[in-house]
Design a protein with these regions (language model features):
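PRPP-associated nucleotide enzymes
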Residues: 1-159
């Protein structure tokens, strides 16, 4: 799935020279690193990866003071690809977009997710999807990654 996402990113962006991958903490970061690695293998250039802490920008968690986000040099000419493990309501993505916007004005922002499980509360649609996995509201998708959990696995758990 990640190899296909990497090829789709290359095709849509005519290469990967002006890309920045922004992994949503926690599991989006290793996914972004894996995609960057695949892009580097294909294109001979590995785009940079940053980690996004979206906690202060969430509207569904207790209010936290939003940190001063560092300006990212060259962001103005870049396409930022936000990478996350699971897309559900869209609230994490909205927070990630706000976090990226605080770092500067990207040329474009795109979204890559490993799993799209539906049930959106916001009008957000990913540009790149590893797997569409329709679920019931009372189910939860758990993504386990080698880097964070010691194994690669996706499971659906009833709540």
């Amino acid at each position: 799935a990640l190899t296909r996402i990497a090829f789709e990113i290359i095709e849509k962006n005519h290469g990967c020279r002006n890309l920045l991958l922004a992994g949503v903490h926690t599991r989006g970061v290793p996914l972004a690193e894996r995609i960057a690695q695949k892009l580097g293998e294909v294109e001979g250039f590995r785009p940079p990866v940053i980690a996004l802490d979206i906690g202060p920008f969430r509207d569904d968690l207790p209010h936290q003071e939003a940190p001063v986000m560092p300006d990212i040099p060259g962001l103005a000419g870049c396409t930022v690809v936000i990478v996350d493990d699971v897309l559900y309501t869209g609230r994490s993505v909205r927070a990630a977009i706000e976090a990226v916007s605080r770092m500067g004005r990207a040329a474009r922002i795109q979204l890559a997710v490993l799993i799209d499980r539906g049930h959106r509360e916001l009008p957000i649609r990913p540009d790149y999807v590893g797997k569409n996995l329709p679920t019931a509201q009372n189910e939860r998708v758990q993504v386990h990654l080698r880097e964070t959990d010691g194994r690669d696995q996706v499971t659906i758990v009833k709540q």
